[in-house]
Amino acid sequence: MTGHAPLVGVIGGSGLYKLEGIEPVESLNIDTPWGRPSSPITLFKLPSGPVVAFLARHGVSHQFTPSEVPSRANIAALKKIGCQVIIAFSAVGSLREEIKPRDIVVPSQIIDRTKSVRPCTFFEGLGVVGHAMFGEPFDTELTGLVTKSIKEAVTGFEMNDRIGVHAEKVAICMEGPAFSTRAESNMYRMFGGDIINMSVLPEAKLAREAELSYALIAQITDYDAWRESEEPVTVAEVMATIAANVSVSNRLTLTILDEVHNAVAKGQLKTCKGTMEYSVMTKKEMISEESKKTLSFILPYFS
């Protein structure tokens, strides 16, 4: 890797397979103890000069289902190249009338409705037990900065590009790949969910274990299946909304990345560095050298 390490990593969701309008400077293929990421990591140079890292969650050809995404490799690779912060994008369904297609949500909480088929911890199979603090699943300082940045950017848009911006919402993460039944969609509403997707977990948990600050930018594409007055969501509907929103998304992304990078570089964001050091229950002298080597890929104090 040439030049300065990227401080900010971007994980692109459905429809976001690269960063438009900025210069790619390098493509990296990173091997991790948990395999290779879902795509090469591309380093992009922002117009203001800094470099950011990007990978496509589902692969450049969208070949990984939500259950197949190699999230451990994705997070580990971004940590290895120097990222301290992850901004993740995801196409999501709305569970609330007031959260409309094309709106953006920066959630603050998650309800896990996955089915334990996705590897969800870096400690599995290593003879090591770690318990990450996860009461606030998204970094609160980072989500605050991202929300502020988006709201300020949106006020400068032309009227036909105006979108709603929502914060402090609850994301449901379901297994997929099929969409919800109407009954499930209504159940998630009763749970208190505001949006629904298939990707935020285990991504957010793994980011916490790797001591990376993590925020999700959720782009609303549909109303899921709870509205009896219309047909349930389809892939065609999702992709049509993404296509209609692509220019807005690109402008927002550049603004957000600049502001987040500057905040990290100036020490204005408290990062998650060191948060896992006292979250491991297993005595260090009882951990095998092989396991220490594996974990040191993301947590240097195992070296």
UniProtKB/Swiss-Prot annotation:
**Chief location category:** cytoplasm
| GO biological process terms, semicolon-separated | L-methionine salvage from methylthioadenosine; purine ribonucleoside salvage
The entry's phosphate-binding residues are: 14, 57-58, 90-91, 199
Choose one Gene Ontology CC annotation of this protein and give it: nucleus
Checking Pfam families in the record gives: PNP_UDP_1
Which pathway?
Amino-acid biosynthesis; L-methionine biosynthesis via salvage pathway; S-methyl-5-thio-alpha-D-ribose 1-phosphate from S-methyl-5'-thioadenosine (phosphorylase route): step 1/1
Has the keyword Cytoplasm been applied to this entry? Answer: yes
Site residues by UniProt (Important for substrate specificity): 180, 235
Against InterPro entries, the record matches this protein to: MTAP, Nucleoside_phosphorylase_d, Nucleoside_phosphorylase_sf, Purine_phosphorylase-2_CS
Keywords tagged on the record: Cytoplasm, Glycosyltransferase, Nucleus, Purine salvage, Transferase
Molecular function as annotated in GO:
S-methyl-5-thioadenosine phosphorylase activity
Q: What is its EC number?
A: 2.4.2.28
**Catalysed reaction per UniProt?**
S-methyl-5'-thioadenosine + phosphate = 5-(methylsulfanyl)-alpha-D-ribose 1-phosphate + adenine
Residues noted as binding substrate in the record, renumbered to the chain: 198, 222-224
Q: Which CDD domains match?
A: MTAP_SsMTAPII_like_MTIP (cd09010)
Lineage, top-rank taxon, reads Eukaryota
Please state where this protein is localized.
Answer: Cytoplasm; Nucleus
Q: What HAMAP family does the record point to? A: MTAP (MF_01963)
Q: Which family does it belong to?
A: Belongs to the PNP/MTAP phosphorylase family. MTAP subfamily.
Subunit: Homotrimer.
Function, as annotated, reads: Catalyzes the reversible phosphorylation of S-methyl-5'-thioadenosine (MTA) to adenine and 5-methylthioribose-1-phosphate. Involved in the breakdown of MTA, a major by-product of polyamine biosynthesis. Responsible for the first step in the methionine salvage pathway after MTA has been generated from S-adenosylmethionine. Has broad substrate specificity with 6-aminopurine nucleosides as preferred substrates.
The name this protein carries in UniProt is S-methyl-5'-thioadenosine phosphorylase 1
